[in-house]
């Protein structure tokens, strides 16, 4: 976990400022994935720990670790770009890198860009991402990620 936190901080240094705002920091406990192939015995509950820091109204940085649908540990790091807001939801993409999927790239790191919608309240938020299937290497799903701001 130390390496993950160090990597997240390193990636944010380009945007680092002396006036860090804790109200822009979100913490999440992983994902819930509703898989398109529900008959494959995949893990829907994907517990973990992640962080998201809202840089401005359109950009945020994210990193975390979770137990994926193949029941293996995955790490991710990336950035959200959400230039549109419709009915209170920020719309855009999240791009970055993932690892830990045994059938995808031998469990190694791979890039991904996913469409995402986010709702952010005062204390709680929700990210909804569409994960497209990748042949027999990565199973498609709609993934939900609850997030909370710490006081």
Task: Please describe what each predicted stretch is.
Residues 29, 49-53, 63, 77-83, ...:
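Residues on the lipid-exposed face of transmembrane beta-strands in outer-membrane beta-barrel proteins
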Residues 29-33, 63-65, 93-97, 128-132:
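Transmembrane beta-barrel strands of outer-membrane/channel proteins
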Residues 17-67, 75:
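Short glycine/proline- and aromatic-enriched beta-strand/turn motifs that initiate or cap beta-hairpins
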Residues 36-44, 66-75, 85, 99-110, ...:
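Solvent-exposed loop/turn segments connecting transmembrane beta-strands
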Residues 11-16:
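N-terminal signal peptide c-region/cleavage motif recognized by signal peptidases
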Residues 1-7:
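Sec-dependent signal peptide recognition
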Residues 25, 57-61, 87-89, 119-128:
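Repeated loop/turn-to-beta-strand initiation elements of outer-membrane beta-barrel proteins
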Residues 19-21, 120-151:
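Predominantly the C-terminal beta-signal and adjacent terminal strand-loop region
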């Amino acid at each position: 976990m130390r390496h993950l936190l160090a990597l997240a901080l390193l990636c944010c240094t380009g945007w680092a400022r002396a006036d860090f705002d804790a109200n822009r920091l979100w913490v999440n406990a992983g994902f819930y994935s509703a898989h398109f192939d529900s008959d494959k015995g995949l893990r829907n509950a994907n517990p973990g720990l992640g962080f998201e820091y809202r840089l401005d109204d359109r950009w945020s940085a994210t990193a975390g670790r979770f137990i994926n649908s193949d029941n293996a540990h995955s790490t991710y790091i990336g950035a959200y770009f959400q230039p549109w807001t419709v009915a209170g939801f920020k719309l855009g993409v999240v791009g970055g890198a993932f690892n830990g999927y045994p059938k995808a790239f031998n469990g190694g790191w791979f890039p991904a860009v996913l469409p995402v919608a986010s709702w952010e309240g005062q204390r709680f938020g929700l990210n909804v991402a569409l994960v497209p299937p990748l042949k027999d290497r990565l199973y498609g799903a709609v993934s939900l990620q609850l997030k909370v701001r710490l006081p």
